[in-house]
């Protein structure tokens, strides 16, 4: 069992790294569990990030995360590419257990575990993962050169995946359960203008077929109930995300969808000394810049909490104006 630290950050990505940067600059010496597989968060799986302010020409997702990570490290954050397997956040001193079984203790914890890709929940889906079924076009798109591919979803991610895949694929079919897209106007127009992309509306995937590799999909029209076959060798699923909050069930208050509840506008959770930021909290905006913003807020909230503790106040201080920018 280690000494008691000021703050432990569980998770990385823009929220975790920004929280690490701010707490490190406040000389709190944060320990950051970046995640073994998920270090860097969802942006590690994106290509060009064109909407993060300050990068006129855009920046690659992994490069942006690498920059943020290095910046946090430069100011003294301790970054560990490891997962957390258990937590006890209920006491005054919080405990966090890593995969090696080492128990780390801290006065404050910031949760930035992010979210993961939602699955269709069909038999065969997991079995064919990596054999035609994927959740990441930028990771796997290259393997589908000159093949027929389906993309499931109607939001920005689905359009982004489809337009990216059209560079490699012979054809891309977007299957959406409604007859209009949720994606932004710019993303829609890009997809509609692409000669390789076609749409199947009002439909869902009823079955994922193939053994040992993906051979096709059975689609069900939600208005008529009719089924049809779509022969594809690639399936990219882009139907949203589920927050990574499994670890915190029974301790931290979650909403109906499993997202961490915080006392807005602060990042405080229902447990004293525990704060939440990034996609694990946010199912509205889900942008790199908003995640970074809440990571900053969580760090400032934790900083104030620790200052109040040092002054002998047992509870969290009231909201105060801050001059930090």
Feature-to-residue mapping (PLM):
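Glycine/Thr-rich phosphate-binding loops of Rossmann-like dinucleotide-binding domains
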Residues: 40-41, 119-120, 159-160, 182, ...
């Amino acid at each position: 069992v280690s000494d008691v630290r000021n703050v432990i950050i569980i998770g990385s990505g823009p929220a975790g790294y920004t929280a690490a940067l701010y707490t490190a600059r406040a000389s709190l010496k944060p320990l950051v569990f970046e995640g073994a597989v998920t270090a860097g968060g969802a942006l590690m799986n994106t290509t060009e990030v064109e909407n993060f302010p300050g990068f006129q020409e855009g920046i690659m997702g992994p490069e942006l995360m690498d920059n943020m990570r290095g910046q946090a490290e430069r100011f003294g954050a301790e970054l560990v590419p490891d997962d957390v397997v258990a937590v006890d956040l209920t006491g005054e001193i919080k405990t966090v257990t890593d995969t090696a079984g080492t128990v780390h203790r801290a006065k404050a914890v910031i949760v930035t575990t992010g979210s993961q890709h939602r699955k269709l929940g069909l038999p065969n889906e997991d079995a064919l993962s990596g054999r035609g079924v994927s959740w990441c076009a930028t990771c796997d798109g290259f393997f589908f050169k000159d093949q027929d591919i389906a993309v499931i979803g109607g939001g920005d991610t689905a359009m982004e995946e489809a337009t990216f895949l059209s560079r490699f694929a012979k054809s891309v079919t977007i299957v959406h359960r409604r007859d209009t897209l949720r994606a932004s106007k710019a993303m829609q127009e890009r997809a509609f203008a692409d000669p390789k992309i076609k749409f199947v509306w009002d439909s869902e995937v009823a079955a994922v077929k193939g053994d040992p590799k993906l051979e096709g999909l059975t689609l069900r029209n939600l208005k008529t109930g009719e089924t049809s076959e779509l022969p594809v060798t690639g399936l990219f699923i882009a139907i949203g995300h589920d927050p990574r909050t499994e670890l915190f069930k029974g301790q931290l208050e979650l909403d109906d969808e499993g997202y961490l509840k915080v006392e807005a506008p602060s990042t405080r959770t229902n447990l004293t000394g525990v704060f939440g930021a990034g996609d694990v909290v946010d199912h509205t905006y889900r942008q790199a810049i908003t995640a970074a913003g809440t990571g900053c807020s969580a760090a400032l909230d934790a900083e104030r909490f620790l200052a109040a503790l040092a002054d002998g106040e047992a509870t969290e201080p009231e909201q105060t104006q801050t001059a930090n920018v």
